[in-house]
Amino acid sequence: MGLSYGIFICFLLLGGMELCCPQTIWPTETYYPLTSRPPVMVDCLESQLVVTVSKDLFGTGKLIRPADLTLGPENCEPLVSMDTDDVVRFEVGLHECGSRVQVTDNALVYSTFLIHSPRPAGNLSILRTNRAEVPIECHYPRHSNVSSQAILPTWVPFRTTMLFEEKLVFSLRLMEEDWGSEKQSPTFQLGDIAHLQAEVHTGSHMPLRLFVDHCVATLTPDRNAFLHHKIVDFHGCLVDGLYNSSSAFKAPRPRPETLQFTVDVFHFAKDSRNTIYITCHLKVTPADRVPDQLNKACSFIKSTKRWYPVEGSADICRCCNKGSCGLPGRSRRLSHLERGWRKSVSHTRNRRHVTEEAEITVGPLIFLGKASDHGIEGSTSPHTSVMLGLGLATVVSLTLATIVLVLAKRHRTASHPVICPASVSQ
């Protein structure tokens, strides 16, 4: 009553509540301005990918730990950050951390993903945040300069050289079984066949013929990894077909600038991972040039135990058995068209870029149902153990019942009187 009366008198004398009540009487909530900044920001640079992640990833006020964040299939770790920083940063090359590259009609697309996989802190067994996966893509136009800087007169970016000077764009893609479209899922079952299509987009360039010089399968995008398997070797010999597989080049070609081949999928027995990468070295020659030992596409046919080329004389494949293919002392005359092409290539080499060849990686190819998939094993092993236990118990019960019946019959035969089963057990 006294407080209300005092406020009423103050209002009459001073004419305002704000002069009478400098302190807020009723409790109020504090409102913070909403921010438009996304929790994950991506900068697609010329040769680098920069990912910036807010520690308040879920917008709940609970900060995540940088150690719970990784990038890509190879689980790349973020840069070291201070505890006072409110963001976590990744800076990686476009081809690092297992990123995947795809060639579309209008762009090169590099794709990867950000993983938040929380772990309990200290000795706790609880989590306060969820696992999250954020897909990331960088699109680079194929018909423009992707450099973020101005082009210097003394330096031509690789993409500019490839698209505007030589007009060559190489690609290696996984295809569906009918070769009609690109395979949407990279998953396989062991025993499946992978359909791969190598191609060069020539633009306004002279007609060219594409070859797969060599291919190698590895567990990571690094083609020089210690654990590897050669698929194509010796300048175009599909050596994987020598083993227990049907791997082969497809003949005839759909076009000179396209080469298709199949590979029986496999996994490395000495490693538990269920993914592989295939890296192929592609090259081109003028379309009118006759294939030779250095430029060929040869498959091994088991029914005849011989090598056969997609085009050209069968003699060019004989070196595949020797494991050494080359043309020592080659001195044949070049055609006028080839001399002009070589001159253009020489000019490109002087600018530090050789665009008649390229090394392309496709992957990862993921194998489902592999024996090392512990999640599958964990779900089936208990069931199998229970079934075995029940089966064993059944066998033991039947055996005991048989023994009891035999003993009862012998006892009846010896004593003649009819004895009820209850007396037998006594």
Swiss-Prot record:
Keywords: Cell membrane, Cleavage on pair of basic residues, Disulfide bond, Extracellular matrix, Fertilization, Glycoprotein, Membrane, Pyrrolidone carboxylic acid, Receptor, Secreted, Signal, Transmembrane, Transmembrane helix
InterPro entries: ZP-C, ZP-C_dom, ZP-N, ZP_chr, ZP_dom, ZP_dom_CS
Cytoplasmic side stretches: 407-426
GO cellular component, one term: egg coat
UniProt-annotated glycosylation sites, renumbered to this chain: N123, N145, T154, T160, T161, N244
Expressed in which tissues: Expressed in oocytes.
GO molecular function: acrosin binding; carbohydrate binding; receptor ligand activity; structural constituent of egg coat
Occurrences of domain ZP (ranges): 43-305
Disulphide bridges: C44-C138, C76-C97, C215-C280, C237-C298
KW Cell membrane (keyword) present: yes
Bilayer disposition of the protein: Single-pass type I membrane protein
Propeptide: 351-426
Extracellular side: 23-385
Keyword Signal: yes
Assembly and binders: Polymers of ZP2 and ZP3 organized into long filaments cross-linked by ZP1 homodimers. Interacts with ZP1 and ZP2.
Function: Component of the zona pellucida, an extracellular matrix surrounding oocytes which mediates sperm binding, induction of the acrosome reaction and prevents post-fertilization polyspermy. The zona pellucida is composed of 3 to 4 glycoproteins, ZP1, ZP2, ZP3, and ZP4. ZP3 is essential for sperm binding and zona matrix formation.
Protein's name according to its UniProt entry: Zona pellucida sperm-binding protein 3
Organism annotation: Canis lupus familiaris (Dog)
Record gene name: ZP3
